[in-house]
């Protein structure tokens, strides 16, 4: 019986501690209207588990804790989009996370929706690597 309890506790610890909010490599699709196509860029962003609590009922003494894995520090990098017309602005600036934290999602700078467009969304029919 103790081995079953140990296994359960170990799995819980692993799920919480080892899948915590951390930097991860992702590929995003970026587009420039002036260029008429999308390109894929590798960048770093935050992903993982954050403790959250959503009560079934409202209790002013115990507010809901809704934390998400989000950036603590950002830098911006710029890439030249190849193949744009000569008169078009071919530079694209995108965020790169350098440090992560579990915190409140800032809707002013982050897509906090349950189902956003996703990192591979492209509004043009043509996509280039």
UniProtKB/Swiss-Prot annotation:
GO CC annotation, single: extracellular space
Alphabetic keyword roster: Disulfide bond, Glycoprotein, Hormone, Secreted, Signal
Signal peptide region: 1-20
PROSITE patterns for the chain: GLYCO_HORMONE_BETA_1, GLYCO_HORMONE_BETA_2
SS bond list: 21-69, 35-84, 38-122, 46-100, 50-102, 105-112
Transmembrane segments: none
Glycan-carrying positions: 25, 42
Localization annotation: Secreted
A Pfam family assignment: Cys_knot
GO MF: follicle-stimulating hormone activity
Organism superkingdom: Eukaryota
InterPro entries reported in the protein's UniProt record: Cystine-knot_cytokine, Glyco_hormone_CN, Gonadotropin_bsu, Gonadotropin_bsu_CS
One GO BP: G protein-coupled receptor signaling pathway
Oligomeric and partner information: Heterodimer. The active follitropin is a heterodimer composed of an alpha chain/CGA shared with other hormones and a unique beta chain/FSHB shown here.
Function description: Together with the alpha chain CGA constitutes follitropin, the follicle-stimulating hormone, and provides its biological specificity to the hormone heterodimer. Binds FSHR, a G protein-coupled receptor, on target cells to activate downstream signaling pathways. Follitropin is involved in follicle development and spermatogenesis in reproductive organs.
Family: Belongs to the glycoprotein hormones subunit beta family.
Name assigned to this protein: Follitropin subunit beta
Organism, scientific name: Bubalus bubalis
Gene: FSHB
């Amino acid at each position: 019986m103790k081995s079953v309890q140990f296994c359960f506790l170990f799995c819980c610890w692993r799920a919480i501690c080892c899948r915590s909010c951390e930097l991860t490599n992702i590929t995003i699709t970026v587009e420039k209207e002036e260029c008429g196509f999308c390109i894929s860029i590798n960048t770093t962003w935050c992903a993982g588990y954050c403790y959250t609590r959503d009560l079934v009922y409202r209790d002013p003494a115990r507010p809901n804790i809704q934390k998400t894995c989000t950036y603590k520090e950002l830098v911006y990098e710029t890439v030249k989009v190849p193949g744009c017309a000569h008169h078009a602005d071919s530079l694209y600036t995108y965020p790169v996370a350098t440090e992560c934290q579990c915190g409140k999602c800032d809707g002013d700078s982050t897509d906090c929706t349950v189902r956003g467009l996703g990192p591979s969304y492209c509004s043009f029919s043509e996509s280039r690597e």
